[in-house]
Swiss-Prot record:
InterPro entries referenced in this protein's UniProt entry, alphabetically: Sig_transdc_resp-reg_C-effctor, Tscrpt_reg_LuxR_C, WH-like_DNA-bd_sf
Residues of the HTH luxR-type domain: 122-180
A single cellular component GO annotation: cytoplasm
Subcellular location: Cytoplasm
Similarity comment: Belongs to the EcpR/MatA family.
Main localization, broad class: cytoplasm
Transmembrane residue ranges: none
Keyword ATP-binding: no
Xref: Pfam families: GerE (PF00196)
Organism: Klebsiella pneumoniae subsp. pneumoniae (strain ATCC 700721 / MGH 78578)
Name of the coding gene: ecpR
DNA-binding region per Swiss-Prot/TrEMBL record: 146-165
MF GO annotations: DNA binding
GO terms, biological process: regulation of DNA-templated transcription
Protein name (database record): HTH-type transcriptional regulator EcpR
C-alpha cells in the first residue's frame, strides 16, 4: 500500500472497491445519526480497513501509516482476526475509535457511535496486543526467526514462543498466516 498516494483519500484502502463503495454508502445511510456533515467527515476522517489481506502492511509499516494520517480522525474497521491489533493501535496512537465488524453487531450504530466521538476505552470488546507481543509480531512480519528475535529482545527463545502463542490466541490465527 502506498501511503503517500492514499493521504488524500478518506477510506483506506481505496483500491478495495467493495469496501470503498460499501463504507461510502453506509456513511451516507447514517447521515441522520451523525452530528458532523458528510463533507467534514470526508475532509477530516480516515477509515482504515483492517482485514487479513492488508494486515501485513499495517503491521510491518505501522509507524509510516500512523504518521501519514497524523492530524486526521482515524477510524479502524476491524475484522475478527484484527480486533486485538486495532485495540493496540487505539491505546497506543491517536485513533478516534474502532468499529468491530461481526455477524451479530449493528455496524451502522457502531460507525455512528465512533464518528460522533463516543467511543471510549470502556468500549474495547476484546484483549489488546501488548507492546512486547507487537514487537515480536513486527519482527516476525519482517521474516525474523525466533532465535534472532530472542537475541534482539534479550529474552529466551521460549519467551518469544510464549508471546507469539499469546498473540495468536488474541488474533484467532497463526502469526505467520497473517503476515504472509
Amino acid at each position: 500500500m502506498e501511503y503517500k498516494s492514499c493521504s488524500d483519500k478518506y477510506i483506506w484502502s481505496a483500491d478495495d472497491s467493495y469496501f470503498y463503495k460499501g463504507l461510502s454508502e453506509l456513511i451516507v445511510d447514517i447521515d441522520e445519526l451523525i452530528y458532523l456533515s458528510l463533507e467534514k467527515i470526508r475532509k477530516d476522517f480516515v477509515f482504515i480497513n483492517l482485514n487479513t489481506a492488508s494486515l501485513n502492511e499495517f503491521i510491518r509499516r505501522d509507524s509510516e501509516w500512523l504518521s501519514a494520517v497524523k492530524g486526521k480522525q482515524v477510524v479502524l474497521i476491524a475484522a475478527r482476526k484484527s480486533e486485538a491489533l486495532a485495540n493496540y493501535w487505539y491505546y497506543n496512537s491517536d485513533i478516534r475509535g474502532v468499529v468491530y465488524v461481526g455477524l451479530s453487531r449493528d455496524i451502522r450504530k457502531e460507525l455512528a457511535y465512533v464518528i460522533n466521538g463516543r467511543f471510549l476505552r470502556k468500549d474495547i470488546k476484546k484483549d489488546k496486543i501488548t507492546d512486547r507481543e507487537m514487537k515480536i509480531i513486527r519482527m516476525t512480519a519482517q521474516g525474523m526467526q525466533p532465535k534472532s528475535i530472542a537475541r534482539i529482545e534479550n529474552c529466551s527463545v521460549k519467551t518469544v514462543y510464549t508471546h507469539r502463542r499469546n498473540a495468536e490466541a488474541k488474533l484467532y490465527s497463526k502469526i505467520y498466516k497473517l503476515v504472509q
